[in-house]
Regions:
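Structural signature of FAD isoalloxazine-binding scaffolds in flavoprotein oxidoreductases
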Residues: 22-40, 88-118, 133-140
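Oxyanion-binding "anion nests"
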Residues: 152-172, 178
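Residue-level signal for inorganic ion chemistry
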Residues: 1, 18, 112, 141, ...
């Protein structure tokens, strides 16, 4: 779909679940390409290494990691949206973020070439990455997680979701987080 839109010189927008997206009431004159159920596979490649497609819900991925006894993605249990967008913005919460566990991301670059970027090439920072800067499209990614106790991982996820419910009005529509967390420095 992306290559077709480029060939026909049609403006296009890649959309996952639509979290962190606000469209104008005037609409979008172009093609909206949904990355969702058709790109939502999760596979255990080898001990601790998981390959996940970009359309996978971050919450579904967190649940699957817990089921498989893989620790380190609990922070994502309540994050709306898909993995592709999560990687692009280095999504995170409760002292965890994508950059803590990603090994590689397979992306489509602006020339239509598929590239595999290692974690350090992704330039993951606080809610930013090279994916945003270069307008890459995430196709899938590989992650590494340590083994853990499935019940302990699930309990940690329940605790984080409880804290999230206590602090956020989840029963109401929301545009999500508005402000970045400020980092404060003190003089030595």
């Amino acid at each position: 779909a992306v290559l077709y839109a480029k060939e026909k010189k049609l403006p296009f927008y890649i959309l996952g679940k639509g979290s962190n997206v606000l469209f104008s009431d005037e609409g979008f004159r172009g093609v909206v390409i949904e990355v969702g159920k058709g790109m939502s596979g999760i596979a255990l490649e080898r001990a601790g290494v998981v390959r996940v497609q970009a359309g996978t819900s971050m919450s579904a991925m967190a649940a699957k990691m817990a089921e498989w006894g893989l620790a380190g993605f609990e922070f994502a249990a309540g994050i709306p949206g898909t993995l592709g967008g999560g990687i692009a913005m280095n999504a995170g919460a409760y002292n965890g973020e994508i950059k803590d566990c990603i090994l590689t991301a397979t992306v489509l670059d602006q020339s239509g070439r598929v590239r595999i970027l290692k974690a350090d090439e992704l330039e993951l920072g606080y809610r930013t990455s090279i994916i945003q800067k270069e307008e890459y499209i995430v196709l899938e990614a590989e992650f590494y997680f340590e083994s853990g106790n499935p019940e302990g991982i699930k309990a940690h996820m329940r605790d984080l979701n409880s804290r999230r419910r206590d602090k956020q009005p989840l029963e109401f529509p929301s545009a999500g987080s508005t402000f970045k967390r400020c980092l404060l420095y003190t003089s030595p």
